[in-house]
Amino acid sequence: MTPDCAFDAIADGYDSQFTETTIGATMRRAVWSRCADRFAPGSRVLEMNCGTGEDALWLTRRGIQVVATDISQAMLQVARSKLAASPGGAAAHFRRLSWEELGTLDEAPFDGVLSNFGGLNCVSDLRAAARSLATKLRPGGIAMLCMMGPLVPWEWIWFLAKGDPRRALRRLRRSGTQWSGVTIRYASIAETRRAFAPEFRTLRASAIGVLLPPPYTERGMSRFPRAIKTLNRIERRLETVWPLPMLADHYLLELERV
């Protein structure tokens, strides 16, 4: 199965399975909090792997001009419908585009870019992606990259307790893991920083889901909403404290185009 078909297949159920879940929504709000500090109203932001448009909707509501891209036509259709149905009819420009095709986008320069929740984990050549992205951002522009990390104690404990060591340790495989024909790689923070240098310098790295449990634990953990709120509150205070970012389900890198 090709990457576009793989994501087409999950488009209709993505929001119910992640976006609208307690844990998924909590993690997304943590990313939004950082984006609010980096993207000013009126700025132009490129969103890569926009999925069902939840981030594009939030950005446009803040007065940000958004060009939102994804490899999946089905995801883009959900995103277009979501924005059209929103109060006031929020508007973004949608494009079918993969990371590998970024060089063909002719709407640069942008003030910022957002790649949320693991889109870059599906890219085989981070260095090539970084070079392409550098041509689309103005000097001083900000890249917000939220990626799945390789070292996740929550995952080890969860799947080992279920007697599934293969899934517990899947992120440690250097060759990546396979999902519906897509290779998913789990680059460390250090590896991603190296791939994006020298065009980008790192401003901040934070943990998204280190005390919070991973989204796939939703069925069991949603029974404890107060615990999730407490864990999130503590996590937000400690999100940049080393080594928490490198032990999180996702890490958020904030990079500046030099």
Name these PLM-found stretches.
Residues 52-101:
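Class I SAM-dependent methyltransferase SAM/SAH-binding core
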Residues 127-139:
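A short glycine-rich, Lys/Arg-flanked "PGG" loop and its adjoining helix->strand segment in the class I
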Residues 104-112:
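A short acidic, Gly/Pro-enriched loop at the edge of an enzyme's catalytic core
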Residues 1-40, 54, 58, 142-171:
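Conserved class I S-adenosyl-L-methionine
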Residues 181-200, 205:
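Short alpha-helix
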Residues 111-125:
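A short SAM/SAH-binding and catalytic strip from SAM-dependent methyltransferases
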Residues 194, 204-258:
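A C-terminal cap/extension of S-adenosyl-L-methionine-dependent methyltransferases
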